[in-house]
Structure formats: structure tokens, C-alpha cells
């Protein structure tokens, strides 16, 4: 049996790719990468995929074997090296987290049907691969509240269950899979559901100077962990639009802060008696390496303490790389921590 405790994300391969090309898809991740991951001690990968890989907007309902072949080969490699695979829809018809303000998925019945039909198709395709592959329905929902996501999620679960009653399904809450939003998910009486959250706290440490975050770029400070944010009062005084950051003044960045921010997920599990999974966590690669190692050490120790599986973001590139282009770890100590190897 495979385990889903110590995982790593394969972002940037068939999701969030820079260019839609056969050359990229054939070379970004190969069997050698999966072998490297397994040899490091990881027990699973999370494979984000974007729907255009397998379905064209011009031919709805016709699924592309050339795109599906990348999922197939990743699954075969994972089976060869005894790894689990979490298949995560990162970009759905009418929705992706980067463009949530222009999303149409939650108001367009045609897009919703496409979303459910894709999962229905994948459930049939991988009906005999229950041990190695789990399904994560949608990455990082961002909605005013959980109402529309709950409705679509329940419809999708029902469709999958008509085909496969024991497939592990991973379901995340609103607001970018926030631990605080798990409590607002619709209740499901199903023994094969795992509740998924993401964890990038404290944000201005894990995303320091992130080029895609207006607030991180504006603050533009090097932040160390453990430590504190510097210059908050002066920054807010000069940038009043970020007045919300005053609550970060004198905040101690340490393991107890991580525990506090993880608490909503733990309380949700205690109340619901369910399984939890952290589908993404990590620290931007431009952060101080020593701080990066210490944050992961503290966070992994909490996941271990609370018996929660998870997958670090990200195997390579995507600004959070754990490995470089030559499959060399940025830090062997960091890899050992992430693979939960006791040294």
C-alpha cells in the first residue's frame, strides 16, 4: 500500500506551464525525476493539471489522448517506484485561482457540466487504479462564500460515486484552501473523503518579495524565521492602503504562530472525525536558506504531531523550488526534513 504522508508537488509541468508545447510536456518531468523523488524518501506526488491538457474548448466532451498520456505515464512511474499520486485540477473550465475575478464556472451551467464530466471521465478511466491515485476536485476556490462551491462539489462527488464508491477524493475549502474555511464545507457522509487545506503562513515571510503579490512587492523586505517583521509602522505610515499590516507589528514568527494558524484545521478534524491533508505549503526560494529550512522543520514537525499528510510546493521552478534543473536539492537537509526522514 502506498502512503500519502510526505509528498511534493509537480507544478509547472501540465499546469501553470510557460508554453503549451510537446517539448515542454515531454521534458519538464521525466521518469528520472520520479525516481529522484522516490529515492529521496517521498511517498507521493501531487500532480496539478489544467483542463486544456485533456479537453479543447472547441471539442467539448472529446478527451485528448496525447494530453492524458502525461497523466498515464506519471501514474506508471509512480507505480514503478511505489509512490502515490494526487491528481489535482488546477485550472477548470471557467475557473482558475489566479483569475477568480473573471470566473464563470460557478454561474455557468455548461461550464459546471464540463467540470463534472471531466471527473466522471477520469473516474472511469482510472477505475482500476484506486491504490495509487486519488482525485483532488479543484485547486484553491475563491468565492464570496462557500455556497456555490458546495453545490458544485456535492454534484461532482455524486457523479464520481456513481462510478467508483471507494476512490479517495480530496476536497478543499474557500479562500485559497484556507484552514479557516474548512468548517464552511458542506457535510458529506462518505468514508473516502479527505479534507484538504493549504498553508503559507506567515504570508510576508513565505512570499517575501513575491513578484505576483502587490503587497509583498510593496513591503519588499527580507524576512527571517524565526524572527519578526521589521519596519511595519513606517511602512504603513507611508503606505496607508496596507493599514491591515499593522496587526503584524511585533508579531513573533515562530512555531507557536504556525500552530495557532493551523488550529482551525485541527479543530475541524476533531469535530468531524475526518482525514486531513495539506496539499500545498512552502517558502519562496529567494528567502534566506537557513530560515527556509527552519520554517519547514517547524511545520513538518506540526504535521507529524497532528498526523497530517502533505505535499510541499514545489519540486522545481515555480519560485519555490526544492530541486534545481539538474535534480540536485537546494539543500539535502531540507529534503530530509520534507521526506520526513529521521537523521
From Swiss-Prot:
Enzyme class at the top of the EC tree: hydrolase
Superkingdom as given in the UniProt entry: Bacteria
Pfam family, one: Cellulase
Modification after translation: The signal sequence was not cleaved in the protein expressed in E.coli.
Pathway: Glycan metabolism; cellulose degradation
Active site: residue positions: 140 (proton donor), 280 (nucleophile)
Keyword Disulfide bond among UniProt keywords: no
Keyword Repressor: no
Reaction(s) the record says it catalyses: Endohydrolysis of (1->4)-beta-D-glucosidic linkages in cellulose, lichenin and cereal beta-D-glucans
Stated role: This enzyme catalyzes the endohydrolysis of 1,4-beta-glucosidic linkages in cellulose, lichenin and cereal beta-D-glucans.
Any one GO BP annotation for this protein: cellulose catabolic process
GO molecular function: beta-glucosidase activity; cellulase activity
Stored PANTHER family: ENDOGLUCANASE, PUTATIVE (AFU_ORTHOLOGUE AFUA_5G01830)-RELATED, GLUCAN ENDO-1,6-BETA-GLUCOSIDASE B
Alphabetical keyword list: Carbohydrate metabolism, Cellulose degradation, Glycosidase, Hydrolase, Polysaccharide degradation, Signal
Protein name: Endoglucanase C307
Entry EC number(s): 3.2.1.4
GO cellular component terms given for this protein: cell surface; extracellular region
Signal sequence interval, chain numbering: 1-21
Family under the similarity heading: Belongs to the glycosyl hydrolase 5 (cellulase A) family.
Amino acid at each position: 500500500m502506498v502512503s500519502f504522508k510526505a509528498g511534493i508537488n509537480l507544478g509547472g509541468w501540465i499546469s501553470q506551464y510557460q508554453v503549451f508545447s510537446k517539448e515542454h510536456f515531454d521534458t519538464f518531468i521525466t521518469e528520472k525525476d520520479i525516481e529522484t523523488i522516490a529515492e529521496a524518501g517521498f511517498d507521493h506526488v501531487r500532480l496539478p493539471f489544467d483542463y486544456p491538457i485533456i479537453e479543447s474548448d472547441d471539442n467539448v466532451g472529446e478527451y485528448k489522448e496525447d494530453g492524458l498520456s502525461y497523466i498515464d505515464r506519471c501514474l506508471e512511474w509512480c507505480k514503478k517506484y511505489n509512490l502515490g499520486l494526487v491528481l489535482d485540477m488546477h485550472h477548470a473550465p471557467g475557473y482558475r485561482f489566479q483569475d477568480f475575478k473573471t470566473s464563470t464556472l460557478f454561474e455557468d451551467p455548461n461550464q459546471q457540466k464540463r467540470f463534472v464530466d471531466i471527473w466522471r471521465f477520469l473516474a472511469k478511466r482510472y477505475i482500476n487504479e484506486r491504490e495509487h491515485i486519488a482525485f483532488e476536485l479543484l485547486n484553491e476556490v475563491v468565492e464570496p462564500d462557500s455556497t456555490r462551491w458546495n453545490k458544485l462539489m456535492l454534484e461532482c462527488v455524486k457523479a464520481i460515486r456513481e462510478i467508483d464508491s471507494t476512490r479517495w477524493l480530496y476536497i478543499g475549502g474557500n479562500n485559497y484552501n484556507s484552514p479557516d474555511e474548512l468548517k464552511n464545507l458542506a457535510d458529506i457522509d462518505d468514508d473516502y473523503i479527505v479534507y484538504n487545506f493549504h498553508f503559507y503562513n506567515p504570508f510576508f515571510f513565505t512570499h517575501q518579495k513575491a513578484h505576483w503579490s502587490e503587497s509583498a512587492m510593496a513591503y519588499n523586505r527580507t524576512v527571517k524565521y524565526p524572527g519578526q517583521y521589521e519596519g511595519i509602522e513606517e511602512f504603513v505610515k507611508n503606505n496607508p492602503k496596507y493599514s491591515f499590516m499593522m496587526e503584524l507589528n511585533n508579531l513573533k514568527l515562530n512555531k507557536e504562530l504556525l500552530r495557532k494558524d493551523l488550529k482551525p484545521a485541527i479543530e475541524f478534524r476533531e469535530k468531524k472525525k475526518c482525514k486531513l491533508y495539506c496539499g500545498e505549503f512552502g517558502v519562496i526560494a529567494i528567502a534566506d536558506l537557513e530560515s527556509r529550512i527552519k520554517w519547514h522543520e517547524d511545520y513538518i514537525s506540526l504535521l507529524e504531531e497532528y498526523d497530517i499528510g502533505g505535499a510541499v510546493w514545489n519540486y522545481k521552478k515555480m519560485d519555490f523550488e526544492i530541486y534545481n534543473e539538474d535534480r540536485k536539492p537546494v539543500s539535502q537537509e531540507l529534503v530530509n526534513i520534507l521526506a520526513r526522514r529521521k537523521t
